[in-house]
Amino acid sequence: MRSLIIVLLFPSIIYSMSIRQCEKTEEETWGLKIGLCIIAKDFYPERTDCSVHLPTASEGLITEGNGFRDIRNTDKL
């Protein structure tokens, strides 16, 4: 029931935000970060030798399992 409430609230939060495109003459840039947490029951991780390049940081590690990928920033480890 709690996950249903979160799913129903998420679109209303997105549609209530107003985002405009920055003009070339403006000196400031506005950024918007939206985080979404998905909890999967019975997550079985499998070790992989993959890594992904994160544009805002260094490399990240990937763990896969049940169709989900776990990406972690190595700067924060």
From Swiss-Prot:
<keyword id="KW-0732">Signal</keyword>
<keyword id="KW-0426">Late protein</keyword>
<dbReference type="InterPro" id="IPR038687">
    <property type="entry name" value="M-T4_sf"/>
</dbReference>
<protein>
    <recommendedName>
        <fullName>Protein OPG195</fullName>
    </recommendedName>
</protein>
<feature type="signal peptide">
    <location>
        <begin position="1"/>
        <end position="17"/>
    </location>
</feature>
<dbReference type="Pfam" id="PF04491">
    <property type="entry name" value="Pox_T4_N"/>
</dbReference>
<dbReference type="InterPro" id="IPR016399">
    <property type="entry name" value="Apoptosis_reg_M-T4"/>
</dbReference>
<dbReference type="InterPro" id="IPR007580">
    <property type="entry name" value="Poxvirus_T4p_N"/>
</dbReference>
<comment type="similarity">
    <text>Belongs to the orthopoxvirus OPG195 family.</text>
</comment>
